[in-house]
């Protein structure tokens, strides 16, 4: 509960409407807040099956440039990595997206820094991670490749050169407000191949604005995720015994501003 309260304080900073910007301005600000039953990232639970409160703030320009920040409570720093204190993830990212010709293709390139403030013994590898990415989208489909440029990758040392490839689809069901999704990804850890795994997900999300204007910006969803990760390498340390790559079903509610 303490971790959730801390996350609520932080994400509450972005849970207010952005400053007024003229409708025809090239500058756009947006924010979002999410409550989820489990924070699952690329198939791996970041909260050990516990709930998370998350929030983000984004700026975009008509040219295609964007930047933003996002935060969530996490549990794996203490329960898996060996941190003596640490229960937050804070991300900062920037990139550029745009159209390719008239074929309906959309590209997105950028970089993201994952930061995990906290205390850890000197023999524990820091969790902070630097990633660059490139994505190509067409209609309902997206292919995204992420490459890690930091020496440490989510707590694994000497792992620069690790990468993650994902293929996903997001299909709206007519004008119902329902969107069905599916994805598959594969994570390869340089010099840490025992940690390699594939993950997959199926999901459904519903735009509550279809129910009434009072719910504009609210989305509810459910997702099922699973991996082929080795439990010997992805299970929390004693006294916790949660396999972080286990199959799980999550539900969430998001409010966008």
Regions from the PLM with identified roles:
Residues 1-28:
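Cleavable N-terminal export/targeting peptides
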